């Protein structure tokens, strides 16, 4: 348990609140529903509350490698995965024999037993486990690992270890300094219009440098790649093309399968399982541009603290982890919860769109459809059309401006994003991006 003394100060509206709150369990009891917090002592002000706890206590590993019965050396036996994607030999798995040794199989069996017993893995164990599974490419083993991890409940250490293993084999986009991503875990089942995609375009129109990652739909009618393709954005760009789009147009999109060849091994298993796995949580951490800043939406309020601690441990310069009324993004449905993550600390604040003059809406107001339908909606909203979807884009773009330090408060971000959205400037950003992406494709 981590016990901390909380202080409050608001970056929601620029109002400075000060004072000492009572001591409380800072990480284990955090939850929120539509902006209402059940945290002891937090309700100093109905919609503007914040608390702080030490990052040292928040992210220190709960057990070290010396305590584990399953070590990285168990997986020294490895071979080239046969994954295209441009990663160097130095980034590949350690070289050894063509097939897994009996000792590594035995060790992995021991790991499976520990998961059955609901014992958490260390960060190193999780990383080594995924390296072994990618090398073996055995669907039965991958399925067992993912299901048992989900049944036990993934820890932030496990999430970080798995993310490190994935990034070892990622195709990187270099040189995008101070870029931001707006990304969600998905899995909320709401089938809304592509809010994070539209928000990314709006944030770019506001001056942010956006390096967005995404994929085609897996759980909804239209994924980010689907709607961007319908809009005319070229998806199959290499690192130089992405860099050109971001530097010249303010925004670029990295198609996950192109940049994470290891997903060719894990992807088929996930499709067959048809359940949420740790890869739903991992996605936001796997940006090939290794962005400094991110707005990360999570589909369940219980994941907010876990994701915040994982992002901090992973080395994110600053991130906002958000959840609002069952959605993996900020929305006008109601209030929500945000964790502000930096290397030094993790702070929580609640927000309510009403404080920014944004009225409530229903889920039906945000409902999307197929790629062509969603593309048409986004074009209208980016051209200046008002309504619930415009309000959603404004909220999330404002969060991106805040996390990348382009504004000082969420309220200031909302003001900037609202002015740009209503002016129709964002549609020019989209059209410019489409043009640059097509030019970049021709020069590949």
UniProtKB/Swiss-Prot annotation:
SUPFAM superfamilies: Nucleoside phosphorylase/phosphoribosyltransferase catalytic domain, Nucleoside phosphorylase/phosphoribosyltransferase N-terminal domain. The keyword Ribosomal protein does not apply. Transmembrane segments: none annotated. Keywords: Amino-acid biosynthesis, Aromatic amino acid biosynthesis, Chloroplast, Glycosyltransferase, Magnesium, Metal-binding, Plastid, Transferase, Transit peptide, Tryptophan biosynthesis. Mg(2+) 1 binds at residues 196, 329. 5-phospho-alpha-D-ribose 1-diphosphate binds at residues 184, 187-188, 192, 194-197, 212-220, 224. It holds the Pfam family Glycos_transf_3. Its EC number is 2.4.2.18. Gene3D superfamilies: Nucleoside phosphorylase/phosphoribosyltransferase catalytic domain (3.40.1030.10), Transferase, Pyrimidine Nucleoside Phosphorylase, Chain C (1.20.970.10). Binds 2 magnesium ions per monomer. InterPro entries: Anthranilate_Pribosyl_Tfrase, Glycosyl_Trfase_fam3, Glycosyl_Trfase_fam3_N_dom, Glycosyl_Trfase_fam3_N_dom_sf, Nuc_phospho_transferase. It comes from the Eukaryota. GO terms for molecular function: anthranilate phosphoribosyltransferase activity; metal ion binding. Anthranilate 1 binds at residues 184, 215. GO terms for cellular component: chloroplast; chloroplast envelope; chloroplast stroma; plastid. It is found in: Plastid, Chloroplast. Anthranilate 2 binds at residue 270. Mg(2+) 2 binds at residues 328-329. PANTHER family: ANTHRANILATE PHOSPHORIBOSYLTRANSFERASE. This is Anthranilate phosphoribosyltransferase, chloroplastic.
């Amino acid at each position: 348990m981590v016990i901390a003394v909380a202080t409050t100060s608001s970056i929601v509206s620029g109002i400075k609140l000060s004072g000492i709150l009572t001591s409380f369990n800072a990480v284990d009891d955090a939850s929120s529903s539509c902006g209402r917090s059940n945290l002891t002592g937090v309700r100093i002000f109905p919609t503007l509350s914040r608390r702080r706890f030490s990052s040292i206590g928040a992210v220190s590993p709960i057990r070290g490698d010396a305590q584990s019965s399953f070590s990285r050396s168990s997986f020294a036996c490895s071979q080239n995965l046969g994954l295209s994607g441009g990663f160097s030999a130095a980034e590949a798995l350690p070289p050894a024999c063509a097939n897994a040794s009996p000792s590594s199989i035995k060790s992995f069996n021991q790991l499976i037993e520990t998961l059955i017993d609901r014992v958490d893995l260390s960060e190193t164990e999780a990383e080594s486990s995924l390296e072994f599974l990618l090398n073996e490419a055995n669907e039965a083993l991958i399925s067992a690992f993912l299901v048992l991890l989900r049944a036990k409940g993934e820890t932030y250490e496990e999430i970080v270890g798995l993310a490190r293993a994935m990034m070892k084999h990622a195709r990187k986009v270099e040189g995008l300094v101070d870029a931001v991503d707006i990304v969600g875990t998905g899995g909320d089942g709401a089938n809304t219009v592509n809010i994070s995609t539209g928000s990314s375009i709006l944030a770019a129109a506001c001056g942010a440098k956006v390096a967005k990652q995404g994929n085609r739909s897996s759980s909804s009618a239209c994924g980010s790649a689907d709607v961007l393709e319908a809009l005319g954005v070229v998806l199959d760009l290499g690192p130089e093309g992405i860099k050109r789009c971001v530097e010249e147009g303010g925004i670029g999109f990295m198609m996950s399968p192109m940049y994470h060849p290891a997903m060719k091994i894990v992807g088929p298993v996930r499709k067959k399982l048809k359940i949420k796995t740790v890869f739903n949580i991992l996605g936001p951490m796997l940006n090939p541009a290794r962005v400094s800043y991110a707005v990360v939406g999570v589909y369940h309020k219980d994941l907010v603290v876990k994701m915040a601690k994982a992002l901090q441990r992973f080395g994110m310069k600053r991130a906002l982890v958000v959840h609002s009324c069952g959605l993996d993004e900020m929305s006008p449905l109601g209030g929500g919860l945000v964790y502000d993550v930096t290397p030094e600390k993790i702070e929580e604040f609640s927000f309510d769109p009403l404080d920014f003059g944004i009225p409530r809406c229903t889920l039906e107001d945000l409902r999307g459809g197929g790629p062509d339908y969603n593309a048409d909606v986004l074009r209208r909203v980016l051209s200046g059309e008002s309504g619930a979807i415009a309000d959603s884009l404004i909220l999330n773009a404002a969060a991106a401006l805040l996390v990348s330090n382009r504004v000082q408060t969420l309220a200031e971000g909302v003001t900037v994003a609202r002015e740009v959205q209503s002016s129709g400037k964002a549609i020019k950003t989209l059209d410019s991006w489409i043009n640059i992406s097509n030019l970049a494709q021709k020069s590949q």
